[in-house]
Each structure stands twice: as structure tokens, then as C-alpha cells.
């Protein structure tokens, strides 16, 4: 597997199969003294990893927090089984939280297989307006798998939050009814101690504007850039509000 980024938060550590040495980006933390900074970094690095896995122009994010497992999206339909195989290589047997940012195939492509292959404790996605509900088999297979496995499923709404021990995940969007599937994307802010991430799915500029208008604190350390870096996302105002130290784009050759 080519891993776009494995952020092991002791700084931020990115590595891939072609460059096993990787490189370390320091100073992700702000602390009042070097000793506090060093201790905080050590504690967080032992607790939290965020894997941005290269699945082409699609999204698959695996989060390891202590002994808990979280996934956000599940790639496209191909390459076959890339998501389940990757999770098995990480010794995952149970998924505490599975998230679908929105129902496009390049985000839900292998979610049905994940649900069938692992014990999924909780599943969340956003509400899809009736006019935008997908009619393809991929979406139907995911819903069928959720029903067959009796997964605790929930429509997540802006303003809600989920906590796993002292890891907090806040739902910032969608704030309003999206006019297209991209603007139904769940936008999630994940915070652990003094480190934060923003996961944006394929949220476009309209949803970004709604989130800004809602008054959320968008400042984070790491941004998962919306819609694979497309010009339809990442408005200048949004990027100023987020002001990340690092950004990750999931993209493949066109």
C-alpha cells in the first residue's frame, strides 16, 4: 500500500512504502515550555495515529486511538478489497465508529464489505435529501449490510458531537440542506488534547460558507482538503478560518 500519510502525532510523521525513512515535521504543538511540549508529544504519539491511505481519487481514512478504531469513508469499488485488507493488516477486528462523509461511490465503494467483515459498533452519515438519494447498487448494498448486521446507525447533524474516551469528534456540517451530494458531506472536527483535525469529505464552497456563518471554531492543525483539491472547494475565506499547519489531498491521476 502507498500511504499518503500516517500522522503519528509526536510531531507529524508521514511515511510511505517507497520511502521507509519518511520525514518528521516538528512543532505541531504549542506549549508553554519545552518540557511540557515534549511530554505532551510523547503522550499523544502513543495514543493517536491517523492514516490517509492512498486509494486514488477517493477517500479512506483510518484512525487508531488507543485500542479504538475509526474509519472515515471506504474508497471506490476498485481496487477490490483494498479497505478490508488494509484494516486486517492493522490487526483491526472491531470498528468503534464508521463514518460516511457522503454517498458518492468514491467514498462508499467498499463500505458494505467493511460492515460485513468487521464488527461495527456505530455508523454515522448525513441526511440525504430525497431528490439526491443515490439509486446505484453501491449505496443499496451498504444499506442492506447495515440492516443485515444490525449496526447502530445514526444520521448525524451539525452541532452534535461524539466522544471516545477523551477524543472528541464534532459535527460542523452540513448546516443546511445540500443542493448536491457533495454539499451533504459530514464535516468533522476531531480534537485530542491540543491537536485537531478537520475532515471535510467533498464539501464545496456553499457548505464551507454555511459552516463559517454558523460561527464554528474552524482552526485546526491538519486539514483533509475538500473534494480532492477541486476548485469547487477550499475557498480563500475557508482556508483562512481553518489556517492549518498541514493539509492532505486524496487524489489520483486523471
What is the role of each PLM region?
Residues 1-254:
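Non-globular, low-confidence helical/coil segments that flank catalytic cores
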Amino acid at each position: 500500500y502507498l500511504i499518503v500519510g500516517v500522522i503519528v502525532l509526536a510531531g507529524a510523521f508521514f511515511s510511505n512504502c517507497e520511502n521507509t525513512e519518511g520525514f518528521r515535521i516538528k512543532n505541531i504543538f504549542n506549549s508553554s515550555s519545552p518540557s511540557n511540549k515534549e511530554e505532551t508529544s510523547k503522550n499523544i504519539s502513543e495514543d493517536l495515529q491517523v492514516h490517509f491511505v492512498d486509494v486514488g481519487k477517493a477517500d479512506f481514512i483510518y484512525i487508531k486511538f488507543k485500542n479504538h478504531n475509526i474509519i472515515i469513508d471506504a474508497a471506490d469499488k476498485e481496487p477490490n478489497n483494498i479497505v478490508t485488507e488494509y484494516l486486517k493488516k492493522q490487526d483491526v477486528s472491531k470498528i468503534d465508529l464508521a463514518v460516511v462523509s457522503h454517498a458518492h461511490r468514491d467514498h462508499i465503494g467498499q463500505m458494505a464489505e467493511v460492515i460485513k467483515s468487521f464488527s461495527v459498533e456505530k455508523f454515522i452519515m448525513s441526511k440525504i435529501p430525497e431528490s439526491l438519494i443515490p439509486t446505484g447498487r453501491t449505496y443499496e448494498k451498504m444499506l442492506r449490510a447495515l440492516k443485515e448486521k444490525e449496526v447502530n446507525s445514526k444520521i448525524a447533524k451539525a452541532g452534535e458531537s461524539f466522544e471516545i474516551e477523551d477524543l472528541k469528534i464534532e459535527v460542523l456540517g452540513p448546516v443546511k440542506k445540500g443542493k448536491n451530494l457533495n454539499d451533504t458531506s459530514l464535516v468533522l472536527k476531531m480534537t485530542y488534547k491540543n491537536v485537531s483535525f478537520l475532515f471535510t469529505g467533498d464539501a464545496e464552497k456553499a457548505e464551507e460558507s454555511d459552516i463559517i456563518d454558523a460561527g464554528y471554531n474552524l482552526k485546526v492543525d491538519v486539514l483533509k482538503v475538500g473534494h480532492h483539491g477541486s476548485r469547487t472547494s477550499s475557498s480563500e475565506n475557508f482556508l483562512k478560518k481553518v489556517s492549518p499547519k498541514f493539509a492532505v489531498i486524496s487524489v489520483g491521476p486523471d
